[in-house]
């Protein structure tokens, strides 16, 4: 605890705090939001952490690839198969795990790869940081998750290249913080009434054997749902394709079934939002760029 208000910072002291916490409460994980605008939390002026007795989806993610850090032979490295670019460090040695994490964070802060729009700084403004998470397993292994973040902007993406892109703002426009990084969608309250209206329009169109354009047309007449119109048209058409190609084939859907379908589609949008936040994409170019970063360590 600290009686002084200190701005968010990811450094040696912050990592020590995370490790101290899991040593004292090994059944809890703990993490911190990133310490830069756009990729950080909503309160950058106040140093704070978040934790709990819960296993987030990121923690269960498959290992896409393992790597070694020659400076830290006691630490096992892994690239997680996750929408964001997440490195996991594992070790029974607290000291080595902490040092390895600090080493990677320091390297990332100064790393530039223009081919994938990653810039350490522009005009003296830093862009690279991490969202760190630490937990301690029952067998005494420390796990450190480092989500690589970059808050660079562009003319095309003025809110951030690695921030939710405009086509998904109807669902999620806000920053991707610690909880979202780990796989839990924190969505704006406005979606509750808006998606209820989307569902109501889709139900009416199904009942009256309407095509997808009818959904689009109705939603564009309401200022609270116009932002969802194009997406709703797409998922309505997708729903029809899953049946017999007509709305009658899905007319028997219950209200709860339709709501679940819409919410599942929201989840798909959220996964794309997380992909937007990933600095190294899961394509050939992104994989090669990630390998270049690891080789630079």
Task: Report each predicted region and the residues it spans.
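Short, well-ordered, mixed-charge alpha-helical segments that flank or form enzyme active sites
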Residues: 7-8, 37-42, 60
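Short, solvent-exposed polar/charged micro-motifs at secondary-structure junctions
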Residues: 39-43, 99, 294-296
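Solvent-exposed, flexible loop/coil residues
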Residues: 43, 62, 91-93
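Cation-handling catalytic/transport regions enriched in His/Asp/Glu
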Residues: 47-49, 63, 69, 80-83
């Amino acid at each position: 605890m600290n009686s002084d208000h200190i701005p968010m910072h990811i450094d040696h002291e912050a990592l020590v705090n995370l490790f101290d916490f899991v040593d004292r409460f090994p059944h809890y994980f703990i993490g911190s939001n990133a310490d830069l605008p756009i990729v950080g939390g909503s309160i950058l002026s106040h140093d704070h952490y978040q934790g709990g007795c819960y296993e987030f989806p990121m923690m269960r993610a498959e290992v896409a690839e393992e790597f070694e850090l020659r400076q830290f032979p006691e630490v096992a490295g892994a690239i997680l198969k996750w929408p964001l670019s997440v490195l996991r460090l594992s070790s029974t040695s607290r000291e080595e795990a902490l040092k390895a994490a600090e080493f990677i964070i320091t390297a990332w802060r100064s790393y530039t790869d223009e081919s994938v729009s990653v810039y350490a700084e522009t005009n003296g403004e830093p862009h690279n940081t991490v969202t760190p998470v630490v937990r301690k397993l029952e067998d005494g292994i420390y796990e450190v998750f480092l989500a690589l973040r970059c808050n660079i902007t562009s003319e095309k993406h003025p809110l951030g290249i690695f921030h939710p892109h405009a086509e998904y703002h109807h669902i999620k426009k806000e920053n991707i913080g610690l909880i979202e990084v780990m796989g839990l969608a924190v969505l704006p309250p406005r979606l509750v009434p808006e998606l209820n209206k989307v569902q109501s329009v889709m139900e009416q169109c199904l009942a009256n054997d309407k095509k997808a354009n009818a959904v689009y047309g109705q939603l564009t007449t309401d200022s609270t749902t116009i932002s969802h119109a194009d997406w709703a048209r797409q998922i309505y058409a997708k729903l029809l394709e899953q049946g017999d190609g007509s709305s009658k084939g899905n007319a028997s859907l219950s209200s709860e079934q339709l709501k679940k379908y819409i919410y599942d589609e929201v989840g798909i949008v959220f996964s794309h939002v997380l992909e937007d936040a990933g600095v190294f994409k899961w394509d050939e170019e992104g994989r090669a760029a990630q390998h270049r970063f690891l080789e630079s360590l």
